[in-house]
């Protein structure tokens, strides 16, 4: 940028030097003589002053000049109206000093781009100062403007002239104006590159048409008639802008004060928190450390900083100054690209200053903390649901997933980050990693059931007792019930043994009694446990001629576990070998003491075959029921337990339900485990259709969506939607738990089987009439497994044999067991075509024996030695290139050509091998019998002597059995 003197500029304009000095003085530029230097800023101030003074109607304005001048002044608009700075307003003398300082700082001349940046920085700094002066002056003249006074000459308001947008003022003569403009353009070649950026800084309200003076070309003004600077309408608009600026300043001052108070409060809270933390730490560790003095808040930066301008960094410094001044961006709630505020990036008040280039650390203000690592590990309380993935468990403990995987691998489980584990395993992992694990109550709809149970209250009335008959197999349980019911159930049972739970109710002169008949066979443990769970009183049947047997002891354990009183029926006392006293002694050893011996258990000697003392047994049962005072609500939704369940081909899922409370009616919505449905039919134990059943009455129900598990609790719900929701939730929950346990079992088997030879597997598919039967059969077959042959139950279910069962058997090479069920025609045809074996049974013994035989056939045969003869060596003949030949006498049995032999010397086995050749005289023979001589050679062995004995034997394979 080149400077000119006042005289040179006056010569270019063809104006007297005195007039030019006068106009400069009126414009706020203090020049005393013609030799004083004029800068570009001085010329701009003079230009703005003449524009205001003479009007804006010139038609010879250069486009380039218009862009340059408007852009520079537009920056003032942005800083004044949009940013609304909260600053200290300097006086007119201070403004002049600042302008002079800016001119002095810009004295060193650099290349064009550097000069452009420096000029722009100075112009914007001066414009900000002028904007403050303008705001103060306009506020002072607000009353005069409202009274309708005309604006004073621009010479009395130099700062006001600089704050308005206007084109270059025209001189009185167009010729002089043209020459001046041409000379100005020749003198300032470095201004042109700055035009695009300055144009980009043009405020939005100017582009929308608010700066109307900038868009119209100026017309020549008459020198004799002075023109008003602005119209009354424009003056009113400016007054309104001034009022808004004053209100904005007041608001910003309030915000600044509030921010300072907030910082002070935060500092106090920070100091207090630090002191408390240090005190707690010192109390814990026993170390006393001096308290850290509180940091003082930084003093507020001055509103306008007149720093020396470095032209190379003028743009960056200017942007930083604008962001640091006041709260221009913060007041609007946005700043920078994307509306993001750098100063309030985190909490709106913490100001961060980045220093220097890459690699410099972030400098924090006093109200910010650097992150401090925790001094001790944090212990979390982890709520663990029934199943949880490894990733979720790690998230709950706030640790990395790899730590959980590592802990599980130490426990012998190979898992992935997305794999589910069961609740027990997860609790162990939580404890292992130092946290507190608690089983979480599932957020399931089953809570509705408890709420509904509490809400329903009905009068409890006496109910019949539920009596379960238990005992060892063939001790006469069903025969006893037959006599009580006057029926012949035993004759209809396969093999004379009970394989289902039978539920009956019997009317006696003293009331109704419900009986549950449980199987006595060892395979039906689960059935006996379910019977004890649903019962009030247990009748323990013991045969007087047989004594206490394993299932008798098991029945005692079930009764004690359920907390149920017992009545002992000593059966078969009509037999000659009956010894009731021995039964009492044996049961006393198992803590079942007769009442006549000082105990609390009634012993009744009965005969189911002849009906002896049956009435006394029923009296004892009813006496126990009176002591228990059994009651249940009648007028309430029914609740009960599933005793047995099966799949009937014609009727669908059929379940035997023992009602425990309430009244079950036809059409009720029943929920039983994972099955639900509306009761379509109810049948009693005699096959008669009934419409309702009260407490302690067993019924057979139809209409469930699936076959429920035996032992499940069942209850009536009023809402089908709620029943469906709970059933589906249970299905998903049980599936997740089952999969998690299966995965754990697979991994355990994988580790256990590492390095072992692969055992043979016998695959079997079991279909039975009721759930209890296939449970018992599957459990018994699995017990037959050995290290060499294992029973693999691929599928077990209730109902007839279907095509899907046959197809599964084809794919897996299994055979099918039908227990009290049959295959339909299509299934039989498919099985015949594919050679799939289907075996039907109605006695559990037979099924177990056949499977055991099949497993025995899969066992590898056992090799045994069978001695065939004995040979005595009487002469040894050595033949070159052949070896030693033994001349022998067969003393016992027979010697065969392919026999194995043992060489025995002095009753010690020297060698075991085979014969290389066997001859009698010169002929090869297959065998030589006792009493004949022979010659023989041993294969690969020549160390034989006279007097040695040879023991001949064969190796035979013997089939093994389980």
Curated annotation (Swiss-Prot):
CDD domains: IF2_eIF5B, IF2_mtIF2_II, mtIF2_IVc. Residues 471-478 are annotated as: G1. Its main location: cytoplasm. PANTHER family: TR-TYPE G DOMAIN-CONTAINING PROTEIN, TRANSLATION INITIATION FACTOR IF-2-RELATED. Pfam families: EF-G_D2 (PF22042), GTP_EFTU (PF00009), IF-2 (PF11987), IF2_N (PF04760). Residues 145-155, 219-234, 270-283 have a biased composition (Low complexity). Residues 517-520 are annotated as: G3. The keyword Cytoplasm applies. GO terms for molecular function: GTP binding; GTPase activity; translation initiation factor activity. This is Translation initiation factor IF-2. GO terms for cellular component: cytosol. It is found in: Cytoplasm. SUPFAM superfamilies: Initiation factor IF2/eIF5b, domain 3, P-loop containing nucleoside triphosphate hydrolases, Putative DNA-binding domain, Translation proteins. Residues 462-631 form the tr-type G domain. One of the essential components for the initiation of protein synthesis. Protects formylmethionyl-tRNA from spontaneous hydrolysis and promotes its binding to the 30S ribosomal subunits. Also involved in the hydrolysis of GTP during the formation of the 70S ribosomal complex. Residues 571-574 are annotated as: G4. Residues 607-609 are annotated as: G5. Residues 99-366 are annotated as: Disordered. InterPro entries: DNA-bd_dom_put_sf, EF-G-like_DII, IF2_II, IF2_N, P-loop_NTPase, Small_GTP-bd, T_Tr_GTP-bd_dom, TF_IF2_bacterial-like. GTP binds at residues 471-478, 517-521, 571-574. Residues 496-500 are annotated as: G2.
């Amino acid at each position: 940028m080149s400077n000119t003197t006042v005289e040179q500029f006056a010569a270019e304009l063809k104006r007297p030097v005195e007039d030019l000095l006068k106009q400069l003085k009126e414009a706020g530029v203090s020049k005393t003589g013609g030799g004083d230097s004029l800068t570009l800023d001085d010329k701009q101030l003079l230009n703005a002053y003449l524009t205001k003074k003479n009007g804006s109607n010139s038609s010879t304005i250069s486009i380039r000049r218009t862009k340059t001048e408007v852009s520079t002044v537009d920056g003032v608009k942005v800083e004044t109206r949009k940013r609304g700075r909260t600053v200290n307003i300097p006086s007119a003398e201070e403004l002049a000093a600042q302008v002079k300082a800016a001119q002095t700082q810009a004295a060193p001349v650099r290349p064009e781009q550097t000069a452009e940046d420096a000029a722009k920085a100075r112009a914007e700094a001066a414009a900000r100062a002028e904007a403050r002066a303008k705001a103060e002056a306009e506020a002072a003249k607000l009353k005069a403007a409202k009274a309708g006074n005309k604006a004073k000459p621009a010479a009395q308001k130099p700062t006001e002239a600089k704050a308005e947008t206007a084109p270059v003022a025209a001189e009185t003569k167009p010729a002089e104006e043209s020459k001046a403009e041409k000379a100005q353009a020749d003198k300032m070649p470095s201004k042109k590159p700055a035009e695009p950026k300055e144009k980009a800084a043009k405020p939005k309200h100017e582009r929308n048409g608010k700066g109307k003076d900038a868009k119209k070309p100026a017309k020549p003004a008459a020198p004799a008639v002075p023109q008003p600077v602005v119209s009354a309408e424009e003056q009113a608009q400016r007054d309104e802008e001034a009022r808004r600026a004053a209100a904005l300043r007041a608001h910003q001052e309030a915000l600044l004060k509030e921010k300072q108070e907030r910082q002070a409060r935060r500092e106090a809270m920070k100091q207090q928190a630090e002191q408390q933390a240090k005190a707690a730490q010192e109390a814990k560790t026993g170390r006393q450390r001096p308290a850290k003095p509180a940091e003082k808040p930084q003093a507020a930066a001055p509103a306008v900083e007149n720093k020396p301008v470095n032209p190379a960094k003028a743009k960056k410094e200017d942007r930083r100054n604008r962001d640091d001044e006041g709260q221009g961006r913060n007041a609007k709630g946005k700043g920078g690209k994307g509306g993001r505020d750098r100063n309030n990036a985190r909490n709106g008040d913490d100001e961060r200053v980045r220093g220097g280039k890459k690699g410099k650390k972030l400098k924090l203000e006093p109200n910010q903390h650097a992150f401090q690592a925790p001094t001790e590990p944090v212990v979390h309380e982890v709520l663990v649901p029934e199943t949880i993935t490894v990733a979720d468990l790690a998230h709950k403990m706030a640790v990395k997933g790899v730590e959980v995987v590592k802990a599980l691998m130490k426990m012998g489980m190979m898992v992935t980050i997305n794999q589910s584990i069961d609740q027990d395993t997860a609790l162990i992992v939580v404890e292992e990693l130092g946290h507190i694990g608690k089983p979480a109550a599932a957020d399931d709809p089953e809570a509705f059931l408890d709420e509904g149970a509490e809400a329903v209250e009905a009068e409890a009335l006496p109910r019949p007792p539920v009596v379960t008959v238990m005992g060892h197999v063939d001790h006469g349980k069903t025969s006893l019930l037959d006599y009580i019911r006057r029926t012949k159930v035993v004759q209809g049972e396969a093999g004379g043994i009970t394989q289902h739970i039978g539920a009956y109710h019997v009317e006696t002169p003293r009331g109704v009694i419900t009986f549950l008949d449980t199987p006595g066979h060892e395979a039906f443990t689960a059935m006996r446990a379910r019977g004890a769970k649903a019962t009030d009183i247990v009748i323990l049947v013991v045969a007087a001629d047989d004594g206490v047997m394993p299932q008798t002891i098991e029945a005692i354990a079930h009764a004690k576990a359920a907390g149920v009183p017992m009545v002992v029926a000593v059966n078969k006392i009509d037999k000659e070998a009956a010894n009731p006293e021995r039964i009492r002694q044996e049961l006393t050893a198992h803590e079942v003491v007769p009442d006549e011996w000082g105990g609390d258990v009634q012993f009744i000697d009965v005969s189911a075959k002849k009906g002896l003392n049956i009435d006394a047994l029923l009296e004892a049962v009813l006496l126990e029921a009176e002591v228990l005072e059994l009651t249940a609500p009648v007028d309430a939704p029914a609740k009960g337990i599933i005793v047995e369940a099966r799949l009937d081909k014609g009727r669908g899922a059929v379940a035997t339900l023992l009602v425990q409370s309430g009244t079950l009616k036809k059409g009720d919505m029943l929920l039983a485990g994972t099955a639900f449905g509306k009761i379509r039919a109810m049948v009693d134990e005699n096959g008669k259709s009934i419409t309702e059943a009260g407490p302690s009455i067993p019924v057979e129900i139809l209409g469930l969506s699936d076959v429920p598990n035996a032992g499940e609790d069942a209850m009536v719900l009023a809402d089908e939607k709620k029943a469906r929701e709970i059933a589906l939730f249970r299905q998903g929950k049980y599936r997740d738990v089952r999969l998690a346990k299966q995965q754990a079992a697979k991994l355990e088997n994988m580790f256990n089987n590492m390095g072992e030879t692969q055992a043979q597997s016998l695959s079997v598919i079991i279909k039975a009439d009721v759930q209890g039967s296939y449970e018992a059969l599957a459990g018994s077959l699995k017990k037959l497994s050995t290290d060499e042959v294992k029973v693999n139950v691929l599928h077990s279910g209730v109902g007839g044999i279907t095509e899907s069962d046959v197809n599964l058997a084809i794919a897996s090479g299994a055979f099918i067991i039908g227990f009290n069920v049959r295959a339909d025609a299509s299934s039989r045809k498919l099985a015949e075509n594919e050679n799939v074996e289907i075996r039907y049974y109605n006695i559990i013994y037979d099924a177990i024996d056949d499977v055991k035989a099949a497993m025995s056939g899969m066992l590898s045969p056992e090799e045994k030695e069978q001695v065939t003869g004995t040979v005595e060596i009487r002469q040894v003949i050595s033949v070159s290139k052949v070896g030693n030949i033994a001349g022998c006498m067969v003393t016992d049995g027979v010697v065969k050509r392919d026999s194995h032999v043992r060489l025995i010397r002095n009753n010690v086995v020297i060698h075991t091998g085979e014969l290389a050749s066997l001859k009698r005289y010169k002929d090869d023979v297959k065998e030589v019998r006792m009493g004949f001589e022979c010659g023989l050679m041993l294969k690969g062995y020549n160390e034989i002597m006279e007097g040695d004995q040879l023991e001949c034997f064969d190796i035979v394979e013997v089939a093994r059995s389980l």
